Amino acid sequence: MITAIWAQDKNGLIGNNGDLPWHNPDDLKMFKELTLGKTIVMGYSTFASLGFKPLPNRHNVVLTSKTLDVETVSSPEEMCQKYDDFIVIGGAKTYLAFKDILERCIVTVIDGNYDGNVYVPDLVSGMLEASRTAYPATEKSAAREVIMYHKNYLPEAWSEITNPSQLITDLAGPDVYPEPDKVLNALNYTKPEDVKVVILGQDPYHTPGMAQGLSFSIPDGQKTPPSLRNILKELESDIGHRDSQDLTSWAKQGVLLLNTVLTVERGKANSHKNKGWEPFVDEVISYVDNLPQPIIFVLWGKHAQDKEALIKHKQVLKAAHPSPFSAHKGFFGTKPFSTINQMLTEAGSTPINWL
């Protein structure tokens, strides 16, 4: 998770010649609580304002080309290659350098008018406000408001459904798959008006480098999982051989490759069951079921077939799950791909190029 944290006044003022324009012990206490034990990155000027001394009990990194007694990185890209989870603490140029990859912003707005010459760039446009908490003035600190923003992951085309960006942010972590930007890939690649087929999976692959945000799909070059191997085997028997195990080309043609749970912890299958995904995915299924165009829902196995009650208006194609435990009990020989194309053609829709 890439987070930026700062305090500002109502006009966006954050600094005055290298110092804070205010003294607010309550906000400094919150900053300490949020950053202790974490990796923090700052610009050279911010580090200089600290007397070139790292903040204690935090892993300090400075964005600079200069040689220092602490770890340095030359670019945001280098920082992201080294760390998955860090907090950007300033200054203005450093915030701007990380703007396009920020996933969360924690902003304290200090009440009052202050003198200064450094303003925070606009970092939160396009983000969603997650929370806003007001704190009254105390004996030592002016009143302040703490606002939490998080990245908006939901594609504009799907804006009529509940936005799950907060859930993505809450569940994200270095050992959670897929990465936040990939969690909604099924929706990123397939707009509502383009949906022709829905293939329901269960949860993402829990092995590093495999989860793509598309049910059953993995990047080329990875070892083929058993269920995908059986899907490709049935495809070859039904229509022909497919070289790629990356199913993105299906998604781009209108095949919504949707899992019923969209994130997972490394090495722990089904670990994010009952974490909040089920209501969201049920809403997506119901929304797609009410789209005007012909759509075919493909339900392989009991887990997917448990969602059949949500499908009231579209055609449903059912079979056993392609897992090695059940593929010989009603998946192999069902010819789903040619059947789907025949159903699409009969409905006046363009068939899918499965190969």
What does each of the following model-derived ranges do?
Residues 2, 160-299, 303-311, 315-318, ...:
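A polyanion-binding, active-site-adjacent surface
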